[in-house]
Curated annotation (Swiss-Prot):
Keyword annotations of the record: Glycosyltransferase, Transcription, Transcription regulation, Transferase
Record gene name: pyrR
Species, as recorded: Nitrosococcus oceani (strain ATCC 19707 / BCRC 17464 / JCM 30415 / NCIMB 11848 / C-107)
GO molecular function: uracil phosphoribosyltransferase activity
Family annotation (InterPro entries): PRibTrfase_dom, PRTase-like, PyrR, PyrR_bifunctional
Full protein name: Bifunctional protein PyrR
EC assignment: 2.4.2.9
An annotated GO BP: regulation of DNA-templated transcription
Pfam families: Pribosyltran
Length: 177
């Protein structure tokens, strides 16, 4: 049975790490007033909370990206019956974009998000921010800023629940199921 177990990660510390890293990176690279996009669902929760800790770095409303139609596994896992469209209340063309995800694992979610972003236009740059990063990349995608690196066994999965309160849990996957 796959019973989620709470993970003792200090969510506030993860957000402080992520916000500090993003503020520093944007200042070092002189990227003023970037737009922020959260990947539905967990990345949106992270981005919403992160916006409050970024020293007015982002002035546009938060963009929401639903990558359901861009996933490379929907033929295997099926489509969610009520897919909401993406909402980008700004043009991505020639903009510096901060793309936010909750957990970076295989890289496939980020690949799908990048494909969708480029369908809206060609950004000047994309900075990837992840609250948690774990090993297991299947694609050559790395986060630019990370709140925490988490070491998990191959049969473990981390999940963010929320939005209030945000909490991580680890689910142990039985390989015989």
């Amino acid at each position: 049975m796959n019973i989620p177990q709470p993970v003792s990660l200090n969510i506030d510390a993860l957000f402080r790490n992520l916000a500090t890293g993003l503020n520093q990176r944007m200042a070092e690279q002189e990227r003023n007033k970037p737009a922020m996009i959260g990947i539905h669902t967990g990345g949106v929760w992270v981005a919403e909370r992160l916006l409050n800790q970024l020293d007015n770095l982002v002035s546009d409303p938060l963009g929401v990206l639903n990558i359901a139609y861009y996933r490379d596994d929907f033929t295997r896992i099926g489509m969610h019956p009520q897919v909401q469209p993406s909402q980008l209340p700004f043009s991505v063309a020639d903009r510096h974009i901060i793309l936010v995800d909750d957990v970076l694992y295989t890289g496939r979610t980020v690949r799908a998000a990048l494909n969708e972003i480029f369908d809206y236009g060609r950004p000047a740059s994309v900075t990837l921010a992840a609250l948690v990063e774990r090993a297991g990349r299947e694609l050559p995608i790395q986060a630019d800023v990370v709140g925490h690196h988490l070491d998990l066994a191959p049969n473990e999965q981390v999940k963010l629940t929320g939005p209030d309160p945000l909490q991580f849990s680890i689910q142990y996957i039985d390989p015989t199921e």
